[in-house]
């Protein structure tokens, strides 16, 4: 049977996983601080920010610079941002500015949260991408000695307006990243006075420790993190596909409580993930994101549900594209399910199942030879019936059974497919009759162009073929006598002798048969199929043709005289015995006398009365 090949892809197992699909470069994030004043507080200080790498479309969404280096709150050695003259801070104050080295950063795409005298700078970004470099300017002062923070003049008196690289060191940088298909990532690092070694291998293009000879005025930091893909999911349905088209249609229900197991490709082999699931009442299953499945190449294996036969696995969809491959020779596996990106969800990874089919019928005595099994037509038991598959969804079928005592047979639990049913033997005492293809869902399917065989019986899931019947015929016979009808009354009587070795012929649409009467004048034609017959007798030598008589079939006179020595229109049904189709014959008679001269006129010939010769007698 032809499956819907538009939905089926045949393949072999892949040997290697393309790991390049699933790995991404790490994110490198770095920052550099430069004190821009050498002995007086005349300029804002510079902060550089840059990141590189990560997954495609990775963005830096938020950045925190925390200058609280000790216990929470102001401590000796902490730094603060001096943005408003007359507030908390030493000497001059310089408000936050976006310098934007790359020329595209501005207040329109950089959000700022910063309080004068605060120790936390928060920046948010709309579109900060890999290799972008941001420069900002803001005044940074150091708490050289800690005085009462609530007494601002006293507190400011021991602030250092010049914050060297060593003094900015131990400030903390926290960066937040987002990227499609990956979990949000957070990088934490600490500024160091000597930082060039931190940048090795990063690819970042930030100022070096001694850039411009400002080694004692710089601090920097760099670190790398690896993004974690968001978990993926795989889902599908196990459903009843009795029409075998590998498409779940509205009326095709899911199959609950079917077990599925998930495997992952590792080092060229599929190994179990340890995850199994069962279908719900609608036949649906899912290996969900709660399992934390990472991008990779997977395989789903179905445990064949009881009472069903596999139609096939159906490749799924990922973002509208075909997902996975079927396995030649195993319809319970979907393999090569390649999910290269996190937060991807493979769907419609389905398994189609069909219910078994059956076919039944009778071997029976077809009394009227019409090919239709009717009331009163008995079954014939013990006859060998064979079913052979032409094509099925599950292997080759070749089974043989015998009919029950009522003539019935039934083949059950068959895989859907195309079949032929064969009657292997002719019942003893019967002639072969008409075979009638049965029906499936009220429609005739199959044909009987070959005797005692039905073929091309196409059974879809859960279908039952009924009345695939083989008719048999009880043979008919016709008999009678050829006899000497002594009294010429056309009735054979026990005292009248039969005539042996007389030729009797039987004509029908099947041809002509010829026999001779036995020593009692009897003849009998046996093994006749239902039909209309004509009997012809050849008048035996030495006899004259007598009267012929139409015989009896089932108590009724059947046939008619057809001229001399023939009886026609003898209608015989299956099992009929026509009797007393008799042909009477006559022995010839003689007549003699004299022509003479009746001298005395007494009409009696006397011895002396002379004969007359040469007289014409008619």
Regions flagged by a language model, labelled:
Residues 1-25:
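Subset of Sec-pathway N-terminal targeting signals
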Residues 25-228:
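Extracellular or exported targeting regions of proteins
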Residues 46, 229-249, 259, 345-373, ...:
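A short, Gly/Thr-enriched small/hydrophobic beta-strand-prone motif that recurs across taxa
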Residues 134, 283-287, 335, 347-349, ...:
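Short strand-edge motifs at loop-to-beta-strand transitions and within beta-strands
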Residues 242-249, 254, 266-288, 367-374, ...:
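Short, acidic Ser/Thr/Gly-rich low-complexity loop/linker segments typical of extracellular
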Residues 279-291, 351, 403-411, 470, ...:
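Glycine-centered loop-to-beta-strand initiation motif
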Residues 294-307, 417-428, 531-542, 616:
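A short, solvent-exposed beta-strand micro-motif common in secreted/extracellular proteins
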Residues 304-347, 425-466, 539-579:
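Structured interaction patches on ligand/partner-binding surfaces of diverse proteins
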